[in-house]
Amino acid sequence: MSPYLAAEDLSMFGTDPWWLVVIKAVFCFAFLMVTVLFSIVWERKVVAWMQLRIGPNRHGPWGMLQSLADGIKLMLKEDVIVKRADKAVYVLAPIVAAIPAFMAIAVIPFGPAGNEVSIFGHRTAMQLTDLPIAMLFILAVASVGIYGIVLAGWSSGSTYPLLGGLRSCAQMISYEIAMGAAFASVFLYSGSMSTSEIVAQQDDRWYIVLLPVSFILYIVTMVGETNRAPFDMPESEGDLVGGFNTEYSSIKFAMFMLAEYVNMVTVSAVATTLFLGGWRAPWPISTFWEGANHGWWPLLWFVVKVQLLLFFFIWLRGTLPRVRYDQLMKLGWKVLIPVSLVWLMLVATVRALRNENYGFSDIALYIGGGVLVLLLLSFLVDMYRDKGGKAADQPAETGTGTGTGTETAFDPMAGGFPVPPMPGQQVPPVPRRRPRRERELIVSGGPDTHSDGPAGGPTDGKEASDG
């Protein structure tokens, strides 16, 4: 071993023997895979019930092995590589998308930080490793997964995957800003970026009660990060066929699907850790039963909370329609990011006042006064904005200034593209190719040009059939 490496303090990575670390790593991988297999079947069952269907019921008891059968089927299919694809990047893209999805689970605690469980005679914590900057690690590996999606769209050599990859990149980058602000508010309030320490700080009250705005922000951003309905614009079948993975098949397509569902499990585990008390038992159980947070019981509470959040994903898919791309970007940049920044400043102010030993009543008074001032300023800005808008719209209502009193014609392209049809709007029809007899000929050359044709009538078969 290098003397420089031996001199470093590696205790933050744990003191478990290497074989125990391997066992815990295999457990984390198996936990993700089993949860994904169950979540796929559960999603198909729940959506089928919501749509008054039966759902999968052929493979295994109650169709529980359907996702396993689908995975085997995909692996046995022909692996087609597009002729115009950049083969090296085309093959690496699913791997780049799948590997970061598994990495974040390494710092998620499944149980108390103390040595609570025994594995082959060794006392160990139910966590693979913990880092002083665990939250930054989660945010970093979530960002790396974007590269796999973008490279998949770019290397496919097709227009639709490229558009899907660009959409996904813009969407995930936009929503990661608000997600990072939600993370920052949590470790500002708790005073630590360690996941196990954040769970320990929720001994009295969960952060869903103390930081409700951060929880709502994270719930919205985690749906956008995973490209799930109603934010599944990168996979929009109506305009992108299948999205960034249109040209993929066999095991490569399965890896993209695996990465999507593993990301769902990972973000649900992160939400459980940050806002729902992590491995802690719910309030009534932990109050009347002290042993609920010891032994292997914390693993049960953690899994139940993760499954509830996965059901939230499924419920969104079966309930809400897909939003437009401009609405998606507007929500991210004009709503989530400003709200997250304002909320982050409020949380930082509360933290500073707590460090100065201010009481709860003083903090509530200062924060309440600041919120009232912000609301008053926003009201004044909206009021002056409405006045300016009415003054600008008045000439359009009275006419063009010529005294005729006619209304200005509505330009459907005035606000940019796309512009949805407004109530009462009359959009001019798309020009079509009309028969020669109904067209007005415009002489732009000699009489014997190909567009004019002979005087006797049309020359091409299409125009003859139109006539």
Curated annotation (Swiss-Prot):
Keywords: Cell membrane, Membrane, NAD, Quinone, Translocase, Transmembrane, Transmembrane helix, Ubiquinone
Subcellular location: Cell membrane
Cell membrane is among the record's keywords: yes
Catalytic activity: a quinone + NADH + 5 H(+)(in) = a quinol + NAD(+) + 4 H(+)(out)
GO CC aspect terms: plasma membrane
EC number(s) reported in the record: 7.1.1.-
NCBIfam families to which the protein is assigned, alphabetical: PRK06076.1-2, PRK06076.1-4
Family membership: Belongs to the complex I subunit 1 family.
Oligomer status and interactors: NDH-1 is composed of 14 different subunits. Subunits NuoA, H, J, K, L, M, N constitute the membrane sector of the complex.
Protein name from the UniProt record: NADH-quinone oxidoreductase subunit H
